[in-house]
Every structure is written in structure tokens, then in C-alpha cells.
Amino acid sequence: MNFFLPAFFLSLFGFFTVLGIRHDLLFSQGFYFFLAFFSFFFVKKYALFFRKNWSFFFWTVFFLLIITFIIGLETRGSRRWLNFYFFNFQSSEFLKVFFIFYLADILTREGYYIDQLKNFVKAILTFLIIVFLIFKQPDLGNAIIFSLIFLIMLLNSAIPKKIIFNFIVLAFLLLPGLWFFLKDYQKQRIVAFLNPHIDYQGTSYNIIQSIISVGSGGFFGRGLGFGTQSKLRFLPENHTDFIFASLVEQFGFFGGIMVLILYGLLFYFLTKKALFFLEKKSESENFLIVIGIIAYFFFQMVINIGMNMGIMPVTGIVLPFISYGGSAFLSSFILLALIP
């Protein structure tokens, strides 16, 4: 329950933020709340079953990711969802959950150097296929999160450091080449981040409106439903990518600090759990699972808040427990319930 309480209060911040800017989303947000909380306690009760059968869930969602790539619902040029009529299922969000368990299993297998090298190759091939499919949706944000989770778990694994070092060097050498595979709008977002004044009404519009929203909130905010930038729709994606700006505009600097404190509590409890497993050599897999969960929440939080503050490029990464959306909201609570 230590993990649930900070997440619960963060989700309340998200609920009231959405309520203040989009009354039309109240019913669906309430439905996601009920579904997420029910799923948390259900998965928590049968957590051992889900952890033992992670492989089935991982490969099932992996298959759904491939299906999404072929026949997924296309919105604004992106094909990221499967339409289940009552729910748009974003397979990449749920795959992140079981990807952590996949990596923890394969990266903690003991054996000779050659066996560990084989395990590393298996892990990286699976990782590259997943990132390729997500990148082609296109969903740069989730591709980045998968990459960061993989890197952090790899650094904390039993894989020989020489193998890891060579991989990181190769990755950095190839990184500049990714520029040529980015969509035009993704390149424009990076350029707008480097020079926000280049196009006020175009590529820089989102960042500028987000900064204005954050600044206009003052210390205690404009009040619930009184955020002019967010409620009057000057701020695009005010309930998803830029919900932190909407939150600060309504609840002010004080509200923003409270959100950071709640995240801090969540990371404190997660770190405490990781250190507990670290002290026990037989718990290396559970240690790596918790490290992956920390990376999952931490990087999404940092990147989302960073792009809302104008200090990171816009990548479409949502804020855990706060941003509106069923798949991300539900998968985050399921992941909490699966903590060993």
C-alpha cells in the first residue's frame, strides 16, 4: 500500500486537473479510475500468478503490438491503438510493463561468459524489434522510454561490463544517424526546442503556450476551472502531453511542488524496496524488476515535466498517474501491483 497511496493522490491531481479543463471527459476519466483501481487490487491479489506467467502476457502483448502495426486505429497520422469498441488499447503501454519482467529474467540468468553473451543478444534483438515497431507507429516518446528502461536495467544486470560498454559506445556512434529516420514534425520539435523563438505560431507554439500556462499560475494557481490558457484551449493537448502545465496553471507552484513530493515518496518507497533486494544475492531478479519500474516512472516524469517547462523537446510522453488516457493510466497501476 506504500506504493498505492502516492499514486492515488497523484491520480486525484490528474482527475481534478482534467475536470477543470475538459468537462466532456469526466465520464471516461471516471471509468478509467474505476478500471485502474479495480485492476490494481485484482492484480495485487493474484500477483504471484501474474509474475509467474509474465512470459505469456509479454508475448501476447508483443503479438498485439505487431497487429497494431498492421491494422491499428490511425489518428493524426499515428497508428498506436487497437479499437476494442469500449476501449482503445495501446499495446506499447502494456508491453512496457512485461518488458521489465522479460529483461529481469533474461539478464539475470547465470552461466559462462558465452552464455551471458547469448542472453544479451536475445535481449537486444527483442528490444530492437519492439523499438522499431513503436518508432514506425510513429511514437518517438515510447521508443525513448523503452530504450532508457533497457539501458538502466542493462547497467544494473549481471551481464559483463565489457559487453555493456561496447554496446553503449556503438549505440552512441549510431545515434546521430537516427535524425534521418525522424518524421518532419519530430525534427521540427527538436529545432523548436533548441530555438523556441523560431516560429511562434508553428512548431514553437506548444512550448510557448506551455511556459505561459506554468507562469500564469502564480503560487496558488488561478483555481479549478479558471485556467485561461488550458481551459480556453490555447494550450494544445492540455489533458495529456501538457497536463502538468494545466495543473500548475490551476493549482499554482504549490500544486506543482505537491506533485513532485508525491513522486518523491513513490521513488523513496521503490528505492527502499530495491535496496532490500540488493542485499540478498538470491533476489537479483526482483532487484532488477524494481530498478526497471523506477526507470519506467522516473524517466516519464522527468521528460514530461521537462517538456512542459520548455527544457526538453516535445516527445509525446505522458505524465504517470496524471495524464488523461486509459492504457497508460491502467498499465501504471498494474505495474505497481506487480512489484515483488
Regions flagged by a language model, labelled:
Residues V18, F299-P340:
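A juxtamembrane structural motif centered on a specific transmembrane helix
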Residues D139-I144, R222-G227, N238-T240, I257, ...:
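Transmembrane helix boundary and interhelical junction motifs in multipass membrane proteins
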Residues F94, F219, F329:
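Residue-level recognition of oxygen-bearing side chains
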Residues A192, P196-T240, F251-G255:
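TM-adjacent membrane-interface loops and short helices in multi-pass inner/ER membrane proteins
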Residues F4-T203, A245-M309, I334:
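Hydrophobic alpha-helical transmembrane segments of multi-pass inner membrane proteins, especially
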